Amino acid sequence: VEEFKDREFIQIDTPWGKPSDNILKTKYNNKEIYFLPRHGRGHLISPSKINFRANIDALKQLGVTDIVSVSAVGSLKEDLPPGKFVIVDQFIDRTFARSKTFFDDEIVAHVSMAHPTSSGLMNSCEQAIKKENIEYQRGGTYIVMEGPQFSTLAESNLYRSWNADVIGMTNMPEAKLAREAEIRYASVSMITDFDCWHPDHENVDVQQVIKVLLDNAKKA
């Protein structure tokens, strides 16, 4: 985001509290865009402590109609090595300590999550990734774990048996809340490691994850 010269930081309050950080307002290709770091600047907020409802509500207040989520993930498949991107189209929600709906107090609402991402936004993400010559896969299932700990070997092998593609900690309930708020959503997952299942690679190492994450950030 440092490359954007015309920058304004906006502070927003919501009925759900404050979002993770002030929201950056800028322009790209003459279009107004917003950026919100879900972990806060400096990466200070644990996945379980992210105020997802405030984040989505703040973006809704700003008139945001489309969200492109970018996140670091572990790979659950041999053909998805570190450095590759996955344009996710499905999720399996394994979180348990997060507020997951706007409709939990004196009102009930149901929304379909059969197809949680926007195909149109996925097309836009794919075009941008192709333009940068980044290796990627279109489509894939993202296991969302609670964290902040990484998987046990048994958990990693279980998720592989489910034919999931990647594992991370942040896209739920984000995608569910975006759907409730009627905001189109797409997810680009940047692979940093092989989780802990791969016999020829070491278990998840924070320093190695950070190294690949920084490389992926340059691509993004």
Q: Where are the regions that the model predicts?
A:
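Metabolite-binding pocket within alpha/beta catalytic cores that recognizes anionic/polar moieties
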Residues: 1-113
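Glycine-rich beta-alpha junction loops
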Residues: 74, 91-92, 141-146, 173, ...
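Short, hinge-like loop/turn segments at secondary-structure boundaries
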Residues: 84-89, 184-187, 203-206
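Generic non-transmembrane alpha-helical segments
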Residues: 120, 124-135, 219
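Active-site/ligand-binding-proximal alpha/beta "capping" segment
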Residues: 128-165
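A C-terminal functional module that forms or caps the active site or interfaces directly
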Residues: 153-194
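His/Asp/Glu-rich mid-to-C-terminal helical/loop segments that flank catalytic regions of hydrolases
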Residues: 196-220
